[in-house]
Structures are given as C-alpha cells and as structure tokens.
C-alpha cells in the first residue's frame, strides 16, 4: 500500500509573494512603531517575578486542589496570585503583589481567611517574606541576557550553515518578532513574568525553525536553477514549502489553543503570547526573512 503525504495545498503553487514585499515591509514597520510607542506610553504589566511582592510559605495536611485554589484566590481582586508547590506536594508557596504597605497585612489576612473558609485543609503558615523590586531587576537582567545569548547562538549557527546575508535576514525577522511580542504584551496587559520570557524564547525558536526550512529550499534552488534570479528563486522556494509551513502552524496553534483555553491562569501569559508569536513568526518567515534576502543578495546573484 502506497502512503501519500498529507497536503493542505496543491503540488504546484505559483503565488507571487515577492510582489507584496513592499507592503509587508511597510506593514511591519507600522506595527513595530505602534509597539514602541505603546510600550513607551503604557509600559508593561510587571508580574510578581519582576515587581516584587509577598511570599507566604504554607504546609497543608493533604494534597491541595491547586487549580481550584488559584481560581478562588484569583477572584479576590488583589492582582496576580501565584501558587506553586515546593518540596513536597503539601508545601505551597503563595505569591502576590502589594501596591502599598497599608494594605499589606490586610491582603495577607484576606488570603488566609479565604483559604480557611473555602478549603477543608489544615494550614500551617511557616513564613511570610517580602520580595523587593531589586530581585525583579536582577531577573530582568537575567532574562535579557538569556535572549541576547539565544540571538548570538542563532546567528553563529546560521552563519556557519548558510551565507552571512541569511543570518542578517533571520536577525531582522527575530527582532521584528520580539518587538511585536513585547508590544502585544503591553497592549493586552499580559503579566510580564518569567513565563513570558520563556514564551519569547519559544517564539524565537519557532521563527528560526520556519525561516531555516525556507532558507534550506532557497539554497537548494540556488544550486539547481543557475539561470534564475534571486527574486524568482525566493518566490519559488516559499511556494514549495508553503504546504509544510501551513500544516506546521495549524497543528502548533491547535496544540497551543488547548493551553490557552484549559491551561488556567498560571500559564495564561505564556500560552497567549506563544499563540500570538506563532502567527507573527510564520508571517515574518514568509514576508520578512525570505524577501529581505534580495536586499543583501541581489548583487551576488543578479550581476
């Protein structure tokens, strides 16, 4: 029995993507400017990881229902409340922000009374600590360094595997994706925390993977069609990989949609940002990183 590959599109596609490169450049520049302006005006909604807050360590007499506890505490109206296990399954860390010292004790007592009234557990409160913004600044610096190191590692990989102008194309696309992701976070007021740093790194990896698939086909077609110009080869390569690109993005979005809908508040910022980033990364790999090669490679291939 012969097995046929799954295809969402016909074998022969001849859509002129390169005809839209000026439109896509303009569109991306406008979106990037909007992101910069919005971030400058409204900043980010920093979560407890970066803004600081209160940490309560508590031990229970049995394994708690964490999703239910997150839901109940999230409805108190005191901002982000993060519950995590540490040590055993009966040890909990409860973190939340505090807008001022005046409501500090009030919010601590509110959390304690809410837990006591809604759950049939015995709570042993072991420690209450204040985490200052200095820790948040250190985490921001660590997150920034993680992104810079990922950029550097990706550039080294691309320059070793491809030509230098391929690396520039991917670098521009990645900067574009990160700017749009940060702008999206600022506009939607998603919590900026450690999980969103992980989401940005995930977006970077996804975008690079998409671009490398197209770049591989471009390199292959450059060897195969010596008489064709770089613009025609790029357009051909995008069309040849389009079915794979669409299949990948659809399956990835569907998997991530489950996290958005059912993952709960604990990973909401991560899942929503990754969902947006998959769309942005797919767009940039087709309309930014591939077409922009014509700027750097025209002189080499179209003499």
Swiss-Prot record:
It is a multi-pass membrane protein. One of its GO terms (cellular component) is plasma membrane. Gene3D superfamilies: Multidrug efflux transporter AcrB transmembrane domain. One of its GO terms (molecular function) is protein-transporting ATPase activity. Keywords: Cell inner membrane, Cell membrane, Membrane, Protein transport, Translocation, Transmembrane, Transmembrane helix, Transport. The keyword tRNA processing does not apply. One of its GO terms (biological process) is protein targeting. It is found in: Cell inner membrane. It comes from the Bacteria. Coiled coil: none annotated. The keyword Membrane applies. The chain crosses the membrane at residues 28-48, 140-160, 164-184, 194-214, 246-266, 272-292. Belongs to the SecD/SecF family. SecF subfamily. Forms a complex with SecD. Part of the essential Sec protein translocation apparatus which comprises SecA, SecYEG and auxiliary proteins SecDF-YajC and YidC. HAMAP family: SecF_B. Part of the Sec protein translocase complex. Interacts with the SecYEG preprotein conducting channel. SecDF uses the proton motive force (PMF) to complete protein translocation after the ATP-dependent function of SecA. This is Protein translocase subunit SecF.
């Amino acid at each position: 029995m012969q097995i046929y590959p799954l295809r969402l599109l016909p074998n022969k596609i001849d859509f002129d993507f390169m005809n839209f490169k000026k439109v896509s450049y303009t569109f991306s520049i406008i979106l990037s400017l909007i992101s910069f302006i919005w971030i400058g005006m409204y900043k980010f909604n920093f979560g407890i990881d970066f803004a600081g807050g209160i940490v309560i360590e508590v031990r229970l007499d049995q394994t708690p229902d964490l999703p239910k506890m997150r839901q109940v505490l999230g409805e108190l109206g005191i901002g982000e409340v993060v519950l995590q296990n540490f040590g055993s399954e009966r040890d909990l860390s409860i973190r939340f922000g505090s807008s001022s010292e005046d409501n500090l004790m009030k919010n601590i007592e509110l959390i304690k009374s809410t837990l006591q009234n809604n759950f049939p557990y015995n709570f042993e409160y072991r420690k209450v600590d204040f985490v200052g913004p200095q820790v948040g600044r250190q985490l921001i610096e660590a997150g920034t360094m993680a992104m810079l190191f990922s950029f550097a590692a990706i550039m080294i990989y691309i320059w070793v595997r491809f030509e230098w102008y391929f690396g520039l194309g991917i670098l521009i696309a990645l900067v574009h994706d990160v700017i749009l992701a940060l702008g999206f976070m600022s506009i939607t007021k998603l919590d900026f925390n450690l999980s969103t740093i992980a989401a940005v790194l995930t977006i970077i990896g996804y975008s690079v993977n998409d671009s490398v698939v197209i770049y591989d086909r471009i390199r292959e077609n450059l060897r195969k069609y010596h008489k064709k110009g770089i613009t025609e080869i790029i357009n051909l390569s995008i069309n040849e990989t389009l079915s794979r690109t669409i299949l990948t993005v659809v399956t990835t979005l569907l998997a991530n949609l489950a996290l958005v809908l059912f993952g709960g508040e604990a990973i909401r910022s991560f899942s929503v940002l990754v969902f947006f980033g998959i769309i942005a990364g797919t767009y940039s790999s087709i309309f930014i990183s591939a077409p922009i090669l014509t700027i750097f490679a025209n002189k080499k291939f179209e003499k």
